[in-house]
Structure formats: structure tokens, C-alpha cells
Amino acid sequence: MLNLSKSSQVKTEANAQEAVHCKLPAGIHRWLHTLLSSLPFKLRINFWNQDSYVFGAEIRETLPQLSLHIGHPGVLRSLILSQDPLVLIDGYLHGLINIEGNLEALIPLIQTHPHIVIKPLQSLQLWVEAYTLPQLPFNLKAMPLKDGQQIHSRDRDKAAIQHHYDLGNLFYQQWLDPLIVYSCAHFEHPEMSLEAAQAAKLDLICRKLKLSPGETLLDIGCGWGALLRWAVQHYGVRGYGITLSQEQLVYNQQQIAQEQLANRLTVELLDYRDLPQQPTFDKIVSVGMVEHVGIKNYPTYFQAALQALKPGGLFLNHGISSSDICNGSSVGERFINRFIFPNGELAQLSTMLSVAEQTGWEIVDVDAWRPHYALTLRHWAENFEQAFDQVASMLGERKARLWHLYLIGCALAFENDYERVYQTLLRSKTDKTWNLPLSRMGWLS
């Protein structure tokens, strides 16, 4: 709850009264009509002063109607002056924009309009009218970059990981599967349950790596440890995991003790850049971690894995990639960077593979999983909706809205090929002898 001083409370109350009595300026109304005229559905906007207008395909009565309530004129003020649709997401998260109908209908609209277009002849009148509207009483801040911290430095990466993953293990348990696997599942058919699909993914990774009893397996960014425990219990390996999340470390230690795996499994709080610089592990896996590395650090990342792998070993890298070169400029990417994954960065698969080859890896296999992640995210979003009230009581209404929007938006991103995900199997170029089966089916048997 906000702790406002008496003077700030008076100012806030005055701002609220001014907002209630503020009319929608005529020029802004005309601009909205032009901007929204091509919508493929009927959109009703209910404004803060009880005014209500219909935009878009209003004559097509058979199309579903979506209703927006804009609770403060400062939303439109900020939208016009910044020309940034991220303002709409800010407003939704703060409860200043409420939606009745299908939330998904708005996400593609925002995604395909990365900038609000204002024609030169409109701009002067719009900006003047926007300035006359009351300001929002607050601004939503992104995760700040502390003085002296550089993007993808060790300290900054640790802070970014903890910003996302240290929301509490109970939070993630509300909507993930029982093993708390926070990465793409593998569905043998669309009706497969999330729990079964996650177990199938874990086992598929173990088979791709050709795990054998007694081998050592390193998991870079091991999360809550489901893959390591699966490999230890089903394939007889000795597991070693690293994470930068304190919450994940605590959970892993609890599970290791509960399942009596202390002599076969170790998890530590460690940066991948501090891995042993000599061959230590028979097999290495990294699932959903490369997105946090940063493109400029790809050589360091692939080199760290290469140095830690024993001769004849395999490295499976599972990560999200971009379908095109956006440079982090799309609305979806900026939203995720600002609120969800600070400093997350996606490259095209070709960039990732090129760096891997230049670092000294041979590419053995590339497996596309985009439809699997779309299905995974649909399961997560559905679970989250069912647990929304519990999440809101834990983290607050704003964060609950934030994560709900994030999961739906990501599902749409994979369904519409804005984002992709691949599993890449690698081995050192110095391993000249082919010690793998000749056919793909042979590896997976």
C-alpha cells in the first residue's frame, strides 16, 4: 500500500477530482476514430467521465465486442505525448484500463503498432489537447540499473535473475506443473497433459545426451532442479547444477535432502563464467538460460561450456530465439525487458549457431520446438487464470495482471512465429571420432 504524506494525499485527491470532470477533447476523439477505424472487431471505450464511444467494425454486428474502460485521462495524455503503446500496458497494470471481453484481441493490435502514428497536421492540435489533460499521479518504473553496473555484468545478471525468479517458489507452484519445470514441454499429441509433457521433455533430453550410469551431468541454470533429479533417478548420473536464484537454491537443497540425493546431486549459487576451466563433466545441458546471457556474451557462454566438457561429451543447449532482427525494439520485447526479464536478449538461431561454431563446437542436431512452447504457454496461462486470486493475494493485483498478460502474450508470440525455440545438440570439434548412432532414431531409442 502506498504511504502518502498529507500534502501528497491532497494533491492526489485534487488530481482525481480534476480527472473525473475532464471531457474528452474533440481532436483526440477524431484521432482515436481514425486510429481504430480498421479494427476487425467492435471496440467500445468507456471513458473516465461516463462518456462512451464505439470504434472499429461497429457495423459488423456479428463480430465479438470488446469493451475498454479508461479510468484516467492521463493515460491518453501519456499515450499521445510518448507515442508509445507501452503506455496502454502501464495503464492496464495499474488498473486504469480495464477490459471486458477477450484480452487476446488487443495484444496483436499493440504488437503490430510498435509506434502510435500521428500525422504532422494532427500533431500540434493533439499535443496541445493532450497537455490540457490531467497527468497521471504516478509512473511505473523499470528495474533500475544501479550505478556502476553494466548490462550483463556478473552483478547485473544476478540482480536480473533474482528479479524474475525470486518472486517466491510458492508463486511458481501456483501455475507450473508439480515438478516446477519452467521451460517448454514436449507434447506427443495436443491433448497430452502438461505434467506428462514436461516429464516427456526431461526424458527426451536425457536420451539425446545419451546419459549412462556413473556419468557426470552439469545443468547450467538448473532452475528448480527437475531435470537433474530426473537424470539422477532414472539414468544413474551424478548431477551438478548452478543457479543465480537464491529461492531456487533453497528449494533444490530441500528436495535433495527430502529425496536423499546428497551423495549424487549438488546445486550451487554460481555464475556460468565461474565454471571450471578444465574438462570436468561428461555431459552438459542448459535449458532456458541462454536468453539471459546477452548476445555479446555468447562467445564467453559457449567457451565456458566447452572448457568444462570432457572429450567425447555432448552439450544440449535449449533456448528461445527471435524469428527476425528486432534489436529489442518490438512492443513485446520492450514489455518483457521492462517488467519480466530485465536485460533478456534474443538472437536469431543463425547468430547463436555461428558463435557456437566459431567457439569450437560441431553442430550435431537442431530440433524446432515452437508449437510445443505455444501449447506449454496455453497450459500455463490457463493455470494462472485459475490461480489468479491466490497470486494477487501473494504479489498484489498489479503483478498478477502483469504475469497474466505476459503468459498470454508469449503464447501468441509463439503461435504467430514472433518467437521460436530450439534444442541444439553440440560436441567439440576436436572429437573427430563419431561415437554417436548414425541415425537420429538410434540416439533416441
Feature locations, PLM:
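Conserved beta-strand signature within the Rossmann-like core of class I S-adenosyl-L-methionine
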Residues: 312-320
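Substrate-binding/catalytic lobe of Class I Rossmann-like enzymes that use SAM or dcSAM, i.e.
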Residues: 320-434, 440-444
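Feature captures hydrophobic
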Residues: 1-192, 196-198, 204, 233
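A short acidic, Gly/Pro-enriched loop at the edge of an enzyme's catalytic core
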Residues: 273-284
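Conserved SAM-binding strand-loop segment of SAM-dependent methyltransferases
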Residues: 260-272
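Conserved SAM-binding loop of SAM-dependent methyltransferases across substrates and taxa
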Residues: 224-235
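A short glycine-rich, Lys/Arg-flanked "PGG" loop and its adjoining helix->strand segment in the class I
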Residues: 299-311
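Conserved class I S-adenosyl-L-methionine
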Residues: 213-221
